[in-house]
Amino acid sequence: MLVLSRKVNESIQIGPDIEIKVIAIEGEQVKLGIEAPQHVDIHRKEIYLSILEENNRAVSFNTDLLLNLSSQKK
């Protein structure tokens, strides 16, 4: 893991298209601004993990449904 220190209004550049800027530091909370192309999905990690979990449940449900339907046709 790369660890960098930044002050307010300083940025980190990721490739040519993504910039992460420190907007404010208030107590233990850091506010970040992220500029990235529209096709890049950006989520807080807990939201991203929730999306992955929901997608896995949906795939599992669809697989079970397909197996159930295919066994009924036989």
Curated annotation (Swiss-Prot):
Main localization of the protein described in the UniProt heading: cytoplasm
Pfam assignment, any one: CsrA
Known role: A translational regulator that binds mRNA to regulate translation initiation and/or mRNA stability. Usually binds in the 5'-UTR at or near the Shine-Dalgarno sequence preventing ribosome-binding, thus repressing translation. Its main target seems to be the major flagellin gene, while its function is anatagonized by FliW.
A Gene Ontology BP annotation from the UniProt entry: regulation of bacterial-type flagellum assembly
Single GO MF descriptor: mRNA 5'-UTR binding
Subunit structure: Homodimer; the beta-strands of each monomer intercalate to form a hydrophobic core, while the alpha-helices form wings that extend away from the core.
Presence of the UniProt keyword RNA-binding in the record: yes
Alphabetic keyword roster: Bacterial flagellum biogenesis, Cytoplasm, Repressor, RNA-binding, Translation regulation
HAMAP family: CsrA
Keyword Cytoplasm: yes
GO cellular component entries: cytosol
Protein name per UniProt: Translational regulator CsrA
Gene3D superfamilies to which the protein is assigned, alphabetical: Translational regulator CsrA
Subcellular location as annotated: Cytoplasm
Membership in a protein family: Belongs to the CsrA/RsmA family.
Gene: csrA
